[in-house]
From Swiss-Prot:
Pfam families: FliW (PF02623). The lineage of its organism: Bacteria, Thermotogati, Thermotogota, Thermotogae, Thermotogales. The gene is fliW. This is Flagellar assembly factor FliW. Keywords: Bacterial flagellum biogenesis, Chaperone, Cytoplasm, Translation regulation. Belongs to the FliW family. The keyword Chaperone applies. It comes from the Bacteria. Interacts with translational regulator CsrA and flagellin(s). Acts as an anti-CsrA protein, binds CsrA and prevents it from repressing translation of its target genes, one of which is flagellin. Binds to flagellin and participates in the assembly of the flagellum. GO terms for cellular component: cytoplasm.
Amino acid sequence: MVYKTKLGEMEISDESIFTFEKGIPGFEHLRKFALVFPQETFPIGWLLSLEDPEVGLPVVDPKLVRADYDPVVLSEDLEEIEAENQEALLFFCVLTIPPGKPEKTTINLRAPIILNQKKKKGIQTILENEDYQLRHLLSEEMERSKTVV
């Protein structure tokens, strides 16, 4: 089906659509989002609202940025997305890219987007791990990961 999104009109398959029962913080009124990976921004993907074409969040697999990223998901979050455990879940973290200053891009490792691909449900949760903050400078995290791997 074709949707109007922040990135323009896009053909989006049902496999890419996730329901966020409680919305996403800041966008609690929006429930349907699509995860897409346009070639021109890969490996950065986009979590696009299918209800408001102005809403789209750049996201990335946190393991690409921080090799030792190891979130622990609370049982109530697993229940909300109907997951038995966290092994089969997909994790993405939201990027903040300041206009004209991509070198100042930050990644939110504290509040990942968690997707249950099987049930097509998602949640953004806040992790209890104090090592993960809302804003980590992307370039510093990638440099740090080189020494971890």
